[in-house]
């Protein structure tokens, strides 16, 4: 699908894609680029599909890590920003450089779609959780074409 519009709202960016009117698309279909997961379809029009991006602050993606096989929830923090893994206990064995994939839990995204990579892990003294930052592999800013994964 071709990009029609990308809003400038940093925290709740909206991507609109042109689609054929005789498509079999559904709400929550995954949207992909060559680099990995971009987001999910949140609204369908006659010739368009609205996409909530993985960077959206309302986005929460169930992931699994490539090396430690740990599950977590990846939260968007805004377009152009890193995402964060939420509520990770300090005993967890995530590693910097680990790639993160969709886990398939929740039945929104299929299992195994590449999402991002852990770029930093810190241990704040004022929290019982680790602060884990994730770099998203895919951004819609410099791309014009996307694939909508129909279930």
What are these regions (language model features)?
Residues 1-151:
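A secondary-structure micro-motif
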């Amino acid at each position: 699908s071709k990009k029609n519009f990308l809003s400038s709202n940093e925290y709740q960016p909206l991507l609109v894609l042109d689609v054929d009117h005789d498509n079999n698309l559904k709400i929550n279909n995954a949207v992909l680029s060559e680099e990995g997961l971009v987001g999910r379809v949140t609204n369908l029009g006659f010739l368009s599909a609205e996409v909530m991006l993985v960077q959206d602050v309302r986005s929460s993606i169930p992931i699994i890590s490539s090396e430690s096989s740990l599950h977590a929830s990846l939260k968007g923090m805004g377009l152009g920003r890193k995402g964060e893994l939420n509520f990770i206990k300090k005993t967890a064995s995530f590693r910097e450089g680990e790639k993160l994939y969709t886990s398939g839990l929740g039945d929104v995204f299929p299992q195994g779609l590449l999402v991002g990579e852990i770029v930093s892990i810190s241990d704040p003294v004022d929290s019982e959780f680790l602060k884990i930052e994730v770099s998203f592999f895919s951004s819609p800013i410099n791309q014009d074409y996307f694939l909508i994964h129909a279930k």
